[in-house]
A protein has these predicted regions:
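Intrinsically disordered, low-complexity terminal regions
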Residues: 1-291
Length: 291
């Protein structure tokens, strides 16, 4: 179990064929690495763990597993390793895997993960670029720019920067996004509780729900599914709402055109089949009751 003296955040590079990675980031002055066979009874996994390189130099930790031919064939046995890392909070991590998952607890800095098949889970990151051919992506808080591409369920608590999410098969749920957000899905619903800036949400199959669009503009589009958009109390809106097979429900009170310099929200909502609803957001009502 290699241990390195790391009084400051470090950079980590992971290159795996098949395997799972678990990273724990906290306030510490060292880094501990443990590489284990995924199945200790398999000779190929034991050999892969033994042959995995673990090197630390000039603030960078490199972990590279051997890439045997069996990792890339469906009949070959797939040598697999499990990697456990404990490191200082704020460290930057970049990892790739042919097949395998990445899970991080604690606060890390820049995070870039790519896997062919496997789940990705982060508790807190400064920046995130997460790509999976197939797998769920679960994130607590991202402080900066976010790019996610996968086929699976996407669940994000809060993004404090701009975001691009592309999901080819699965539902996408975002609690709060501060920056400009573009969310696209081929097959799955899209839900955003609170969008502070411009948001574009499009899906070919599934509903689109924006709990509150604080500033806009808003583009919400579905080929097959309902669209629901909430707007803050007291903010005028410009609406373009169209459904081919469904009903349009505008629950906003009529208002005069906003004056020069007055904030308003521009909304474009379209669906081929499904209802469209525009209303005052429940979060605005909740804030009014608390004041």
């Amino acid at each position: 179990m290699p241990t390195f003296d790391t009084p400051e955040p470090i950079a980590v590079i992971l290159e795996l064929g098949v395997g799972d990675v678990r990273i724990t980031a906290d306030d510490r002055g060292d880094t501990i690495v443990d590489v284990l066979p995924s199945d200790p009874t398999k000779a190929s996994d034991v050999a892969a763990a033994r042959q995995t390189r673990v090197e630390y130099q000039n603030g960078t930790l490199l972990i590279r597993s051997p890439k045997g031919w069996r990792q890339w064939t469906p009949w070959g046995g797939h040598e697999s390793v499990d990697v456990r890392i404990e490191l200082p909070a704020g460290s930057a991590v970049r990892g790739t895997a042919g097949a395998g998952g990445f899970r991080c607890t604690g606060r890390i800095g820049e995070c870039r993960f790519r896997t062919g098949v496997g789940d990705i889970a982060l508790e807190s990151a400064g920046l995130a670029e997460l790509k999976a051919g197939a797998g769920d992506v679960t994130v607590g808080v991202i402080a900066g720019r976010t790019e996610i591409k996968t086929a699976g369920a996407v669940r994000i608590g809060r993004i404090d920067g701009p975001a691009t999410v592309r999901n080819s098969n699965g539902d996408t749920s975002i609690g709060e996004v501060v920056g400009e957000a573009h969310v696209n899905a081929a097959n799955g619903a899209i839900s955003v509780d609170l969008a502070h800036g411009e948001i574009v949400a499009k899906t070919a199959n599934g509903g689109v729900r924006i709990g509150e669009a604080a500033r806009g503009p808003v583009v919400a589009q579905s080929a097959l599914g309902a669209v629901e958009i909430g707007l803050p109390d007291g903010v005028p809106a410009w609406l373009e709402l169209e459904t081919k097979f469904g009903s349009v429900h505008n629950e906003l009170d009529a208002a005069e055109r906003p004056g020069p310099g007055e904030h308003s929200v521009e909304v474009h909502a379209h669906t081929s089949m499904g209802d469209i609803t525009v209303r005052r957001s429940s979060t605005s009502a909740d804030r009014g009751q608390q004041s």
